């Protein structure tokens, strides 16, 4: 697979074209951002940890019948993925109250949400990824009702699979965000799944093991990521 020019550079990943029109190379960098890119730092080993973590999770989801963008690992920091037409909507599933939900509704952090909630956000850094609803998605043509229904179904299926996986590792899956795209007309899970895009707490102590350690200045960010990977059995 020939790596060609950079197609897109995000806050923590870069995307490159290849000699296959249906495949891209995803590079995980050491950049770590918070507050819609207003704060960015370099954290040693982060790119490699997230690349391998993402590969592990995506393979688990594929095995559970959820189609993903992931194809194969290419190096410590690169993987080969399907080229998707991305839908500009983030799907967020919450099992416990945290983050923006706490700020928006004034509820106590850590309250269990039964059943889990499903939320939508427009993927737009300039606007701060605003909270939207299903009517907005349909009215502005970001996805069809059928596509949105499939995204919601897959989101809850991801929650079911990963809740069990993390619980067995002594972790609580507090919440997570997913992005989807179209591959030859079919809805496919895209982007990544790593501690950058979810909240994970130790089941016993409630210690935060995700990017909130960076956002809140708690320190030992990569050490926490590596501990999560170790508990799951991710080969680093």
UniProtKB/Swiss-Prot annotation:
This is Phosphoribosylaminoimidazole-succinocarboxamide synthase. The gene is purC. Keywords: ATP-binding, Ligase, Nucleotide-binding, Purine biosynthesis. The keyword RNA-binding does not apply. One of its GO terms (cellular component) is cytosol. Its EC number is 6.3.2.6. GO terms for molecular function: ATP binding; phosphoribosylaminoimidazolesuccinocarboxamide synthase activity. Pfam families: SAICAR_synt (PF01259).
